[in-house]
Design a protein with these regions (language model features):
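Solvent-exposed serine/threonine-rich low-complexity stretches and specific carbohydrate-binding patches
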Residues: 110-122
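Accessory, solvent-exposed terminal regions and/or long lumenal/extracellular loops of proteins
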Residues: 1-111, 125-129, 136-152
């Protein structure tokens, strides 16, 4: 299970944004006290023509905020636990609540395949099942910074 791929679900707000966090450690030891963990932030931001979904390392910016009661003066993103997760990929990204199907989805310079199921947009007044965009194998890794752009 440690090396199983992840599915990231993004439920857009009425403003077309979303945020969430992922914290991982080995779940068996106290090695997190020495900074052996992964703490990622995920953000979706919207403009009129794009939605950008990004993953950033939160622990490097705020090492004391990752684990309650543990003060870390520094954090190394290449710690032993994070290195053990190198290559663990984001298997898919699912975005709920888009108004329309994107014209294209990119990861860097790579065009990504996706499917879109019509449904209710997050900022509409209709009730029902949310629209669903599924991006399979985007090329992202759980321990890396990355950005996916949806062109609307």
């Amino acid at each position: 299970m440690k090396r199983d791929p992840f599915t990231l679900k993004v439920a857009l707000s009425q403003s077309g944004s979303a945020s969430g966090e992922l914290y991982l450690d080995d779940g068996e030891s106290y090695n997190h006290r020495e900074g052996n963990f992964v703490w990622r932030g995920f953000v979706a931001e919207s403009t009129k023509k794009t939605i950008t979904i990004a993953s950033k390392d939160l622990a490097s910016k705020n090492p004391n905020g990752a684990v309650d009661g543990v003060e870390l003066t520094t954090y190394n993103g290449g710690n032993a636990f994070a290195n053990a997760l190198n290559g663990v990929r984001v298997e898919r990204v699912v975005v709920l609540g888009l108004k329309n199907k994107p014209s294209k989805v990119t990861f860097g310079n790579t065009h990504l395949d996706f499917t879109f199921e019509d449904g209710v947009a997050a900022f509409g007044n209709k009730e029902g099942v949310a629209s669903k965009l599924t991006i399979k194998t985007p090329g992202a890794f759980i321990t890396s910074d990355w950005t996916i752009v949806l062109e609307l």
